[in-house]
Amino acid sequence: MADDGRAKEPQEQETPGEGHNKPKYIWPRWMHKRTFVRALEGTYSNLQQGLLDQPRVFHSTDYEWEGGPQSYGKPMINPMRTEVAQSIETHFHVFGPKGHNKKHGHMNSAVFYVLEGHGHDIHDGERYDYEAGDCLLVPNGVVHQHFNDSDDEQMLVLIMKAKPLFLFMHMLFQKSATMPPDEPVPGHEDFAPPSDL
């Protein structure tokens, strides 16, 4: 009460009191108008259309076999051939009777689907047998080698691996422990990969 008996008008404090009596504080950064996301411009739609326009079917007969004389490979799907599948590589490999390839190892894992024939692999000294219709897994970093066990038939496999993804992650290590044979298997000097694949 004032000296004259009237009620006092509330006055604002110059310094806020404790707890809930403190005035609301406004952060200076919220007081400024800012643009946090600017308009985006680019060629993404062109890239997307380019991917949609890429071929979806690849004919194996359009590509050449490489290697020899005991085994041959044919790269099919990889980032150099198509922009659609940038993280996977797929190729065929055919082994002549009693043929084998080099002993090697790489960082990426691989899946082999055996299309024809039968054979075995050696993974870090362990033997794994397989036949047509089987899938073989080659784990990351395993030193391995593939062998056709037939005396007179070829062995054909489809190999799938995420090698491009591993290369992107800079997991580059790949080495050969032995070179591929440069002489044909005796009695199978005329072995050639299939022309219809």
How does the language model describe each region?
Residues 96-97, 107-119:
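Glycine- and acidic-residue-biased ligand/ion/polar-headgroup-sensing regions
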Residues 73-78, 89-105:
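Conserved short histidine dyad/triad with adjacent acidic residue
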Residues 87-90, 111-113, 137, 152-171:
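A short hydrophobic beta-strand segment most commonly corresponding to one strand
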Residues 101-104, 121-122, 138, 144-151:
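Short beta-strand His + acidic residue motifs that chelate non-heme Fe in jelly-roll/DSBH
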Residues 107, 126, 142-143, 163:
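A generic "binding-loop/recognition-motif" signal
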Residues 2-86, 173-197:
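A short, N-terminal "cap"/entry segment at the start of jelly-roll beta-barrel domains
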Residues 125-141:
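Short acidic-glycine-tyrosine-enriched beta hairpin
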Residues 130, 142, 146-148, 157-161:
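Catalytic cores of eukaryotic secretory-pathway lumenal/extracellular enzymes that build
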